[in-house]
Amino acid sequence: MCEQFREQADAVIDALYARIGEGSPQPRLAPTRRACELLGDPQRMHGIVHITGSNGKTSTARMIDSLLRAHGLRSGVMTSPHLNRLNERIVIDGEPISDEALVANYNDIEPFLVMVDTELAASDEPALTFFEALTVLAFACFADAPVDVAVLEVGMGGEWDSTNVANADVAVFTPIGMEHVEKLGPTLIDIARTKSGIIKPASRVVTSPQQAEVIEVLRGACELNEAPLSVLGRDIHLTAITPGVGGQLIDIEMHSGSYWGLAVPLLGTHQAENAAIAVAAVEQFLGGGEHRLEREVIEEGLAQSTSPGRLQVVRIQPTIIVDAAHNPHGAEALSRAVMSSFQFPSLVVVFGVLSDKDARGIVEALDPIADYFVVTQPHSERARPVEDLADTVTQLAGPDRTSWRGGLSDAIELAIEQAGPDGGVLITGSVAMVGEAMELLSEGEQ
């Protein structure tokens, strides 16, 4: 059955690629709007976060997606280009669209694509392009899921990009520079004006630091549309960036409040800036930028922007690994990754969870790789009490393989003693605890 869907999906992809390539976009919206109209305007069935810029769009989109999902929203993401397969461009619930869903939704929209192609031919206009058809397909997939919010990355520019048939609740601008001058215009101001077209009446706008002339263009578009503008470096502040192994810790200040010590599992100042505007964009989407969001949820969302099963080695002798797995599925992936990547004479797991997590399922997944558990609790009001959690772990792993400590620092110290210089320490179970551990270890407290 899977092979059958793969073959059908390949046929869909071939049909899309048979259209005018995305390197030759048509500066128009009417055909995409017409196709969406025939389908009942699926792009109006959910919230919209729209992202344009010259660099960092996909990273920012993925972070926003992770943050929205951490807040319990079902999200869809459209990005480009893809690495291996077109399915990657349409993401629902953090996963690329399945071949089955891709085929089903394409079959639903294909008659309407043909109808629009026929109308365009009658007017001596080119048929729907690859990207126009893909945009319509993405909207159909999101409506079919259905999602609560779609995060859309423009293909090129903004004003006449096919994704712009959607009306942004939040418009996000990553750094804008000189690009595609043959399509977007010969000057930075021209390019900024084209990109500013994603700003709609009553949109909320968040932007990375920009050159002065770009800020002026964005400010003018915001005034015209009565859209509030938040600028990183003016309204949003990265007050600290602390590099760490496999990532960095950032502090963000904005009108609603501050977020201290957020763990971003990506390297580079540009990724810290992307994370800051992603947090600001989600704040704007959920509460108009007036209400500070729960730190633990923000921390969880940023941590999930990494690749599934990613391991972060934060110290050697003994090797200390942190991983944000906080459900059984993630713990199973983590267990497999540890077994395939490391060969420790002994591995000690420092374990703590929030109260709403499946602790038993996580421990069962980690049990095959753990020689010893040190149970603790994250520094969070939502943490499961350490003694209660220790009872659960002891039932599963046995009293000879379980200890507990009330504070994470003490738990890590005990784990290091148990592991010995050649062993390994794995800190997992809670995103919040991983961030706390990164901060402790970066400060050299262990």
Can you name each region flagged by the protein language model?
Residues 1-53, 60-73, 78-80, 117-125:
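Short functional linear segments
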Residues 8, 36-44, 70-166, 182-184, ...:
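ATP-dependent carboxylate-amine ligase catalytic core
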Residues 45, 149-152, 161-172, 176-180, ...:
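Nucleotide phosphate-binding/pyrophosphate-handling subdomain across enzymes
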Residues 78-81, 208-209, 223-243, 264-269, ...:
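Beta-strand->loop->alpha-helix junctions that form or flank phosphate-binding loops
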Residues 137-183, 216-261:
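Extended acidic/charged loop-beta regions that coordinate divalent cations
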Residues 140-143, 280-287, 439:
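Short glycine/serine- and small hydrophobic-enriched flexible loop segments
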Residues 211-229, 246-249, 319-322, 328, ...:
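C-terminal helical cap/extension that packs against the catalytic core
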Residues 410-442:
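A glycine-rich beta-strand to alpha-helix segment
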